[in-house]
Regions:
Chain B
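A structural signal for multi-pass alpha-helical bundles of membrane permease subunits
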Residues: 67-352
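Transmembrane alpha-helical segments of polytopic membrane transport and secretion proteins
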Residues: 1-76, 163-167, 342-352
């Protein structure tokens, strides 16, 4: 809105608010409905082909570097060796509302040929007709890809709806407790810390608080501005530790005793000043938490292993020199041993990302060849050599993370007990309602009672009252 | 250069100094004498080929020579463009507001007609009512009181200044208005930052107040005053130039105080400009999205003006149907504001 010329402000003032939304209201027809021919095996194009790929990142993000320095030249060379002229362009990104932009692009038949994609968008994009199963876009040849045998079903299922595969997953992750061993040592806490209950987390944080008053004891994501990070590495591990779940026995879980236990934990942490509520409310709170942890001003964080491989790593945004010595990690305990979901002692939550092919692509075959090339053993190995992480492929993981103790810990200790988000199209809305609920609690807008009740009614508004259980 | 010198020059230049919005602003005759408007209107009709025609007088003349179909033919292209680019989106948004249309999910493919559900949902949402309240406070204090008050004060104080001092002040004030919003937001965040922010370093002592968290509404109000004062100042500057200098001198000679001069001479003369400025500033501020760049609407919705509210539900939650409904409510509020101002403006004209 700020780009309107002042001279036209009179008219702009009236219409600015409606223009923005109306301009995007757009076309709700499904461009791929009439694309029945895609079922047949497509022929390689004789003409030069140009493909676009977007990842919503710029250098020095390791994936952006990998795409530009490895994927594009290698793929173009491989195609040229077959006598085919294929060029690939990386569309740089790095925006906050990538998801909305992508949805709008796809809804009008535009967008990159291949795009990176978060696992939890799959159901809603599929329901909206914005993405199509690989078999529909490309053809049956996608089932012949060698990579499927290397990807565990739990992981490939993250980009599937009703048994239909929509894209190739990239990998998965896990949530753990990270802590600064140097601060623990100064506070007289064990550097091989492994709490077995919520109280032990709180006790450690209280010790930090009294021994090192200048240090923020812990970070528990709790702001709307942190978006999915508040849900997945804040609320969910606590809820699971209380024995609760988001969706169980065929219905969404609203105002349950476990929900209230979870909110009480948040309330305790922030009321006692064990975490910094300002950090949750500012617009760049997650970066501030990373910075504080990297600077040694924050002792304990619940985070994804992304913190280890993508933030405090030597090439990351907030590198910690000697992270192997200064940073420890532990499983997230349940409220009491055995009190977690499925009677577990420890809990975690996992997400994942992948890539999908734009159903509007003019070159489905070439797009698939590029996508499967990116998921090949050689390409994935080149990627994890740049950044050790758990990929979707087991053969790559055997060598890719062998020398990274943190990633091995996630693969061996965390993934066996982890939890995946329910694959419903309503999940992202529910997640947003969760973020607002916890923010209201820690900001003092709501107490635990009213926050839980409000969440319950919001949940009913999203999925329908019949599909919610709880109070 | 003396003050007198400047004023005389200014008078000569006055007809070129058009107020962007004012067809009502009477311009002083070079002689600076008595009843302004009737004289000029007469002149306009009698002296034919003047390079600067009076709009009102010419309009009557032209209607007589153009027949209706020709006139329609002339305005049709403009009306067509307005229809396509303004009316259609507005009507379309109204329609979307009656559906559950979403950016993704089943409701993206098959939006359903939900009647007035979105509107009742908005009225029942405490965040909507608080957002409306925040928007009105923001509009009143940053737009009407702040920008107009400071804009008029600056225009009045510097009305006789000429030369480099005046240019410097104008450049400083206008600078804050023409710098792109994203750059300005970055500067203000640096200015208000808790650790190492400019404001905190200016305050004596060891201050680490996070202004955008502790006083978020005040912060965006001050920000917007700083940002938009130039516009009001320019309009008022032009309005003050239309004041016949003799009036002010008469007041001075008869020993009127500044306040008396303002109350009895200046305000009545520029009241039309004030109302127009108030209308523009109010509506502009009401629809402003820029606070988002400072606070994101936070902390915890404390600066969530309606434009940000619409952005959050529309683009954040993907709920275009609901977002369109709230946009339609904003449109209605805009129209009410406009109607109030037009009513006041018309009453004033009738009286005079």
């Amino acid at each position: 809105m700020k780009t309107y010329l002042r001279g036209s402000r009179f008219a702009a003032a009236i219409f600015a608010s409606v223009l923005v939304l109306a301009a995007c209201g757009g076309d709700d027809s499904d461009p791929s409905d009439d694309d029945g021919a895609a079922q047949e095996a497509p022929e390689p194009s004789d003409d030069p082909v140009h493909l676009t790929i977007s990842h919503n990142a710029v250098r020095p993000d390791v994936v952006a570097v990998w795409i530009e320095d490895y994927v594009i030249p290698e793929f173009e060379a491989a195609m040229a060796a077959e006598g085919r002229e294929v060029t690939v362009e990386h569309i740089e990104g790095g925006v906050d509302d990538y998801k909305t932009q992508l949805a709008l692009d796809l809804s009008v038949g535009e967008g990159p040929d291949i795009t990176s994609f978060d696992q939890f968008w799959t159901a809603e994009f599929a329901a909206g007709g914005l993405i199509e199963p690989l078999e529909t876009v490309v053809g049956d040849i996608v089932n012949d890809w060698e990579g499927w045998d290397q990807i565990p079903e739990a992981v490939s299922g993250s980009l599937a709806v009703d048994g239909q595969q929509y894209g190739i997953p990239l990998g998965t992750d896990g949530r753990v407790l990270f802590f600064r061993t140097d601060l623990f040592e100064q506070a007289g806490l064990p550097t091989d810390w492994q709490p077995t209950s919520w109280d032990e987390i709180l006790d450690a944080a209280r010790t930090i608080q009294s021994e090192l008053p200048d240090v923020i004891p812990m970070q528990l994501n709790a702001g709307v501005n942190m978006e999915e990070a508040t849900t997945l590495q804040g609320f969910i591990p606590i809820l699971l530790g209380a024995g609760g779940d988001l969706y169980a026995d065929g219905s969404w879980q609203g105002d349950t005793p476990q929900l209230r236990e979870t909110l009480e934990f948040y309330s305790t942490v922030f009321d006692e000043g064990l975490a910094d509520s300002d950090m949750q409310l500012v617009t760049d709170g997650r970066d501030r938490s990373f910075e504080a942890f990297a600077d040694g001003n924050l002792a304990i964080m619940i985070e994804s292993d992304y913190l280890w491989r993508g933030v405090i790593n030597p090439d990351g945004g907030f590198p910690i020199d000697g992270r192997e010595d200064l940073v420890g990690w532990a499983l997230i305990p349940a409220q009491q041993p055995g009190a977690g979901i499925n009677g577990q002692d420890f809990v975690s939550a996992s997400g994942g990302t992948g890539r999908v092919i734009n159903p509007n692509t003019e070159h489905p075959l070439e797009a698939w060849e590029l996508l499967s090339f990116m998921g090949s053993y050689e390409a994935q190995l080149d990627w994890v050599e740049r950044e050790p992480r758990i990929t979707a492929r087991e053969d790559v993981n055997e060598v890719g993370i062998a020398e990274d103790p943190m990633q091995s810990f996630v693969a061996e200790e965390v993934l066996p007990l982890t939890w995946y988000r329910p694959g419903f199209e309503e999940y992202p809305q529910v997640s947003e309602a969760i973020q607002r609920m916890v923010e209201n609690v820690i900001a003092g807008r709501s107490d635990v009672d009213s926050a839980a009740q409000e969440f319950h009614s919001n949940l009913e508004g999203i999925v329908g009252a019949d599909n919610v259980s709880g109070e | 250069m003396t003050a007198d010198d400047g004023r005389r020059r200014d008078d000569a230049a006055a007809p070129g100094h058009d107020v962007p919005t004012g067809s009502d602003g009477g311009q002083p005759s070079p002689a600076g004498g008595g009843s302004v408007q009737p004289v000029l209107a007469d002149e306009g009709t009698t002296s034919v080929p003047e390079p600067e025609p009076r709009p009102k007088a010419d309009a009557t003349a032209e209607v007589a020579v153009i027949n209706k179909p020709t006139a329609i033919g002339f305005v049709a292209p403009a009306l067509g463009l307005i229809g396509v680019f303004m009316m259609f989106p507005a009507v379309w948004a109204l329609y979307l507001g009656l559906t559950n249309y979403r950016v993704t999910g089943t409701a993206a493919r098959e939006p359903e007609f939900v009647g007035t559900d979105n509107f009742t949902r908005a009225l029942e949402d405490p965040l909507f009512t608080s957002s409306l309240w925040i928007t009105l406070i923001f509009m009143a204090f940053s737009g009407v009181v702040g920008q107009m008050g400071l804009g008029f004060t600056l225009a009045w104080l510097f009305r006789r200044w000429r030369g480099w001092t005046r240019r410097t002040i104008e450049v400083l004030v206008i600078m804050s208005w023409i710098i792109p919003g994203s750059v300005v937001a970055f500067l203000w965040r640096a200015f208000l930052d808790g650790e190492g922010g400019t404001l905190n370093s200016l305050i004596p002592g060891d201050v680490t107040t996070e202004w955008l968290l502790r006083q978020p509404l005040l912060a965006i109000i001050v920000f917007n005053i700083w940002r938009g004062t130039a516009f009001a100042m320019l309009l008022f500057d032009a309005a003050l130039n239309t004041l016949p200098p003799s009036h002010l001198e008469t007041a001075k000679v008869s020993g009127a105080s500044t306040w008396q001069t303002l109350r009895d001479i200046v305000f009545p003369a520029v009241r039309g400009h004030m109302l127009t400025t108030a209308l523009l500033v109010s509506m502009w501020t009401f629809n402003l999205f820029t606070p988002f760049l400072l606070t994101g609407g936070g902390p915890n919705y404390q600066t969530e003006v309606l434009a940000i509210y619409v952005y959050r539900v529309g683009f954040g939650q993907g709920d275009f149907g609901f977002g369109s409904a709230v946009s339609a409510v904003m449109l209605v509020i805009n129209l009410i504001i406009a109607l109030v101002y037009f009513r006041v403006l018309r009453d004033r004209r009738k009286k005079s």
